[in-house]
Amino acid sequence: MAEIGIFVGTMYGNSLLVAEEAEAILTAQGHKATVFEDPELSDWLPYQDKYVLVVTSTTGQGDLPDSIVPLFQGIKDSLGFQPNLRYGVIALGDSSYVNFCNGGKQFDALLQEQSAQRVGEMLLIDASENPEPETESNPWVEQWGTLLS
């Protein structure tokens, strides 16, 4: 089964809740999953030839939460090319804002630029439609976990 690093960007805890639920689901499927709540580049490096799941909200004018900015900047400034990385993204946002789910979209764009391979589609969760994000993320994670080798 797969080894998965779950990297969290959160402001109010919803992304962490989604990540912890994902960890439980993936572990139940036989995968080895680990959540990184305040992730740094050193946490990311062991997963470059494995799987990562980025779970992040969006804050301000479409920005990443402070907790995941150091990781994002570290990847952008230090890594460059990650063709062996396979990843998924769960993005939380509110569609009443112009930059809906932009935190997750930024992460996806960065990893695409670095030739990482996204597994499945990115999940966009709208807080204005679904105040309990795990009800939308849990089925997605169950499906995503079946795509990993």
Swiss-Prot record:
InterPro entries: Flavdoxin-like, Flavodoxin/NO_synth, Flavoprotein-like_sf. Residues 4-145 form the Flavodoxin-like domain. FMN binds at residues 10-15, 99-101. It holds the Pfam family Flavodoxin_1. Keywords: Electron transport, Flavoprotein, FMN, Nucleotide-binding, Transport. Gene3D superfamilies: 3.40.50.360. One of its GO terms (molecular function) is FMN binding. Binds 1 FMN non-covalently. Its cofactor is FMN. It comes from the Bacteria. The structure is significantly stabilized upon cofactor binding. Belongs to the flavodoxin family. MioC subfamily. NCBIfam families: PRK08105.1 (NF005989). Monomer. Probable electron transporter. This is Flavodoxin YqcA.
